[in-house]
């Protein structure tokens, strides 16, 4: 097994995840079995209880792990499901080391960072690669070189080359080269200091990857090579591109894939990048355009909805369309002019979330979509919102609400799942991961998933609340279609409600699941692809003259 470690320097949020995922895509395109590991040096066990404003979205894997959003980047770029144990945190490592000490596994040794903590880190990395059956393991070390939290992880990856041999371990360091407009020059000093800092802990990078606004000129590349002792043909420019899916092509053009093969002693192979080239071509030169309004509460932090935004991009690729996002603050919708805020949208999407803030605005967004025949897609909370709105205004259940928002509501059409009543603690206790959805024949969602006669599909979940089975009959009598269920769930009659839709509407579909977590650039999520297709046909843009979009330069 080969190991590629990616570290970062100068500043955080340089894009190590996207750069690492792009390299993974190049290796996958060459036929290698690749997996990815993300190391997060925080003491949390996982990302599940973190604030979206601080950390971005929580990405849920098929196994139910609540992970860093970069795991989502790896799944999308590598087009595979990342196995359990691939998001390693300081909290996980120390919890296991302390458990072993209490169990007597260390046989009365003095437990220390070296070797006990570093050995546990190395064990977890190797196990992740073995579980994936990988030939090459990409390991991204979160944070910045020089952070005190990262030191045990840097020591562990330093030991890897000693343990595994030079030909099996590769170090890539991502740094920043800022451009100063006042002097019209790229500044390499931060990169020089960052590499020196990395060397001070015993790691010499084999490749330096540089984040910059533009592709670095040859003289700057030569300067970086000289002062970092890295060969010039192993200094790569990770410059700003129009879309992240262009980055694999930009790095391949510079020869990154070949350099990695050479350094790892692999035979050079030719990558098959046709699908990436086609996707980028559509992204840059779409023939159509559509505007989607997202009614959420984290609208100032797009990373809180990263997978959802990427899913809309994938749906745009499938429909040869540019998807423009209109962010709508759900709190402002509650008292605002809906026509002004939603009238120019071709489709309305209400995403997942927790808490009461902005709920009434989201309900108004669902009502607007229903009454104005605007395509609507509800995700997780967005489905619960649609059910509340329908119960209030169509089924005649005045005061209908969710027990999450109003425990004293006269009609709790959304209620806590019985399995959650005895749950203690917040971390890792929701209904998580892949669950089956049995889709009814003849429904819109069954058609979207390619099983018009009905069938079972699997999607990822992250929730504690569900449609109250006591109200399913009344909602159906009022015309709401329960189009998907998880069968065989105790106390749910026909099953736990997984999806709903409104017949006769151009597109009104909502799911309890999070299908955005399984969407890929070349395999878009069926609900998202169908939603964008409906928005293209039904929205204001479809009526505008000259729908074809001028090609971008």
Swiss-Prot record:
GO-annotated molecular function: ATP binding; CTP synthase activity; glutaminase activity; identical protein binding; metal ion binding
PROSITE patterns: GATASE_TYPE_1 (PS51273)
Residues noted as binding Mg(2+) in the record, renumbered to the chain: 70, 140
UniProt binding sites for CTP: 12, 147-149, 187-192, 223
Entry binding sites for L-glutamine: 53, 353, 381-384, 404, 464
Keywords: ATP-binding, Glutamine amidotransferase, Ligase, Magnesium, Metal-binding, Nucleotide-binding, Pyrimidine biosynthesis
GO terms, biological process: 'de novo' CTP biosynthetic process; pyrimidine nucleobase biosynthetic process
Residues that hold UTP according to the record: 12, 187-192, 223
Subunit structure comment from the entry: Homotetramer.
Function: Catalyzes the ATP-dependent amination of UTP to CTP with either L-glutamine or ammonia as the source of nitrogen. Regulates intracellular CTP levels through interactions with the four ribonucleotide triphosphates.
The protein's name in its UniProt record: CTP synthase
Species whose genome carries this gene: Deinococcus geothermalis (strain DSM 11300 / CIP 105573 / AG-3a)
Upper taxonomic lineage: Bacteria, Thermotogati, Deinococcota, Deinococci, Deinococcales
Gene designation per UniProt: pyrG
């Amino acid at each position: 097994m080969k190991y590629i470690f990616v570290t970062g320097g100068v500043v955080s949020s340089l894009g190590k995840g996207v750069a690492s995922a792009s390299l993974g895509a190049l290796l996958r395109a060459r036929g290698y079995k690749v997996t990815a590991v993300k190391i997060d040096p925080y003491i949390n066990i996982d990302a599940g209880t973190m604030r979206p404003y601080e950390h971005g979205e929580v990405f849920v894997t098929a196994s139910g792990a609540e992970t860093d959003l970069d795991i989502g980047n790896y799944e999308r770029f590598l087009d595979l499901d990342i196995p359990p144990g691939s998001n390693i945190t300081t909290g996980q490592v120390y919890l296991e080391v302390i458990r072993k000490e209490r169990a007597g596994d260390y046989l009365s040794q003095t437990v220390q960072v070296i070797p006990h903590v570093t050995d546990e880190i190395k064990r977890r990395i190797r196990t992740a690669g073995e579980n994936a059956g990988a030939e090459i393991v990409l390991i991204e070390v979160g944070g910045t070189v020089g952070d005190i939290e990262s030191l045990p992880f840097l020591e562990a990856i330093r030991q890897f080359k000693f343990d595994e041999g030079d030909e099996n371990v590769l170090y890539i360091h991502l740094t920043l080269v800022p451009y100063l407009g006042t002097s019209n020059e790229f500044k390499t000093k931060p990169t020089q200091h960052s590499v020196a800092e990395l060397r001070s802990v015993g790691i010499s990078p084999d490749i330096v990857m540089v984040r910059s606004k533009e592709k670095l000129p040859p003289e700057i590349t030569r300067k970086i090579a000289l002062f970092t002792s890295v060969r010039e043909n192993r200094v790569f420019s990770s410059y700003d591109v129009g879309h992240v899916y262009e980055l694999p092509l930009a790095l391949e053009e510079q020869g990154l894939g070949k350099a990695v093969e050479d350094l790892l002693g692999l035979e050079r192979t030719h990558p098959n990048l046709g699908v990436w080239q086609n996707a980028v071509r559509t992204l840059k030169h779409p023939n159509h355009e559509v505007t989607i309004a997202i009614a959420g509460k984290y609208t100032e932090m797009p990373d809180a909805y990263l997978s959802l935004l990427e899913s809309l991009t994938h749906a745009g690729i499938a429909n040869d369309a540019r998807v423009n996002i209109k962010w709508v603050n759900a709190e402002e919708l509650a008292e605002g002019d809906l026509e002004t805020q939603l009238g120019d949208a071709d489709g309305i999407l209400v995403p997942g979330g927790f808490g009461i803030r902005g709920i009434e605005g989201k309900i108004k967004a669902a009502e607007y979509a229903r009454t104005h025949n605007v395509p609507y897609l509800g995700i997780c909370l967005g489905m619960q919102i649609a059910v509340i709105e329908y119960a209030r205004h169509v089924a005649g259940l005045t005061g209908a609400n969710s027990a999450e928002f109003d425990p004293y509501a006269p009609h709790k059409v959304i209620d806590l799942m019985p399995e959650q009543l005895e749950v203690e603690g917040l971390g890792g206790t929701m209904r998580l991961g892949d669950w089956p959805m049995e889709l009814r024949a003849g429904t819109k969602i069954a058609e979207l998933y390619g099983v018009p006669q009905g069938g079972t599909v699997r999607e990822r979940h992250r929730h504690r609340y569900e449609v109250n089975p006591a109200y399913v009959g009344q909602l159906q009598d009022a015309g709401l279609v329960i189009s998907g269920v998880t069968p065989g769930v105790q106390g749910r009659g026909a099953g736990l409600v997984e999806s709903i839709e409104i017949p006769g509407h151009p597109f009104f579909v909502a799911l309890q699941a999070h299908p955005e977590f399984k969407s890929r650039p070349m395999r878009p999520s069926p609900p998202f692809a169908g939603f964008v297709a409906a928005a293209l046909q039904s929205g204001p843009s479809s009526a505008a003259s000259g729908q074809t979009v001028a090609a971008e330069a």
